[in-house]
Amino acid sequence: VTLHDARWRGFASDNYSGILPEVLDAIRAANGGHQSSYGADVYTQALGETIREHFGPHAEVFPVFNGTGANVVALTSMMPRWGAVICSSSAHIHTDEGGAPERVSGLKLYTVSHEGGKLTPASVATQAYGFGDEHRAQPMVVSITQSTEVGTVYTPGEIRALADYVHSKNMLLHMDGARLWNAAASLGLPFADFTTHAGVDVLSLGATKNGALGAEAIVVLNPDAVEGILYLRKLSMQLSSKMRFVSAQILALFQESVGITAATHANTMAALLRSTLEDRIAQGAITELAFSYPTQSNGVFAMIDLEVANRLRQKVRFYNWDESRGEVRWMCSFDTTEADIISFVDLIQEELQA
């Protein structure tokens, strides 16, 4: 029984969208009969082979339920109890995971300022000190997000520069890839070019935001970077007994460019939203709206009067990003349509002129 109005659309989150038809088909195909549990199934084996094809021969995959779980298990496996993570002040692990890294694993997070959502060797250096000082939690991992929390995308060169600096300090580089497909679509590059070959040690690979039902994974690119990850996944309650259904979802995104096609569409819709707004601004039809960051993936960040935003939100759902400066976030998904964009821009124009 369908309980919701399937015509209802929003720009709050790519998590609001449904499931890609190909992913639903993959779940159905994995159903029926018996398969070994806890990852000893043919779908998880096939996913491992696919991951190695895309990320290199040493890559190893560990499917989990959600992004917070992927980040917590990955980071915990990368350091001892006295370790600390350096991350952006806007990092998901710092702002949107309910304190899970600290509460579940006891990790210390050192936050640093960001430039358009990105870390640089210079910003990391502000917390990369005190090595060997027993009074200071030891910086051992740097975590970056690709694409970033504000919709920008690291280039391979930027990641390589970070990795070189991080490794020179005997630290490791973790990438939160909740929207990795959107980054790949934006860059037009194979995954390995901005992960494995750029010096990333461990990756949290997202799928849910790109059309999966509920599937993420930890991808270990440097086998020497983790310890005890199998046990940590279990004790962190991220080990699925019927893992074939998790693995099948991620596998479906890699087959026949399903994931890249979906992410490309979401990115294209975000670019259309921005360009349509820019056209209205140039025509003088929209005023008092400005953009916060470049639109490089599937999110548009804008500055708008919050009273106007609140009125808009009565008709179309979206989130405030930084209320202190009147910043909002508009996210596009694999199923966002051009009609959705035009209708939303018309509403923005109408409310700004009210």
Regions found by a protein language model. Give the residues of each.
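Conserved PLP-enzyme active-site core in the AAT-like
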Residues: 2-315, 320-336, 344-352
